């Protein structure tokens, strides 16, 4: 079969493993904290109350007052030299160490955050671009909970529904510590 001109090379047969943590704001700024809190607290798996009432409470009260208090707490733990939250830093390190452990195999290991950046959507797109046909999704929560593991699954499937790509998927819902 003749290769079509101007067609990009296609890489097949790879497996992408995506380790996913809860999330963190991009910085300790009021705006970034507010953005993170809005995404997190708008998740119906996290806050299981009447969505109409909750959105009023969230947008009128919580998102106007809570970011200042939360920013103060983040500033205490923020890794200033790296300009990164500890959760993001250690999640990156986990992904690097896992990647080094499996470097000889046809496995690409990456990380994402359920809320904030890097997003599940951006990382799934990246794994697709690298030619992954299989996805292993590992939420970094040792026990299953709808507010943690299930919301990761929701976001993975929402992302895939919008793509013209359907890899084989293995989700690890819990693991022993």
Regions found by a protein language model. Give the residues of each.
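Active-site-proximal alpha-helix that buttresses catalytic centers in soluble enzyme cores
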Residues: 1-177
């Amino acid at each position: 079969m003749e290769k079509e001109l101007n067609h990009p090379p296609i890489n097949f047969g790879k497996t992408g493993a995506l380790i996913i943590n809860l999330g963190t704001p991009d910085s300790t700024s009021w705006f970034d904290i507010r953005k993170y809190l809005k995404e997190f607290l708008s998740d119906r798996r996290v806050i299981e109350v009447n969505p109409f009432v909750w959105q009023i409470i969230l947008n009128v009260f919580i998102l106007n007052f809570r970011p200042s208090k939360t920013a103060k707490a983040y500033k205490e733990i923020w890794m200033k030299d790296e300009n990164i939250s500890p959760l993001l830093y250690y999640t990156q390190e986990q992904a690097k160490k896992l990647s080094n452990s499996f470097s000889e195999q046809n496995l690409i290991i990456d990380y994402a955050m359920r809320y904030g950046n890097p997003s599940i959507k951006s990382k799934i797109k990246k794994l697709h671009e690298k030619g992954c046909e299989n996805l292993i999704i590992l939420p970094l929560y040792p026990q299953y909970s709808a507010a943690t593991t299930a919301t990761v699954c929701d976001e993975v499937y929402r992302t895939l529904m919008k793509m013209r790509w359907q890899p084989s998927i293995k989700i690890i819902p819990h693991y022993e510590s």
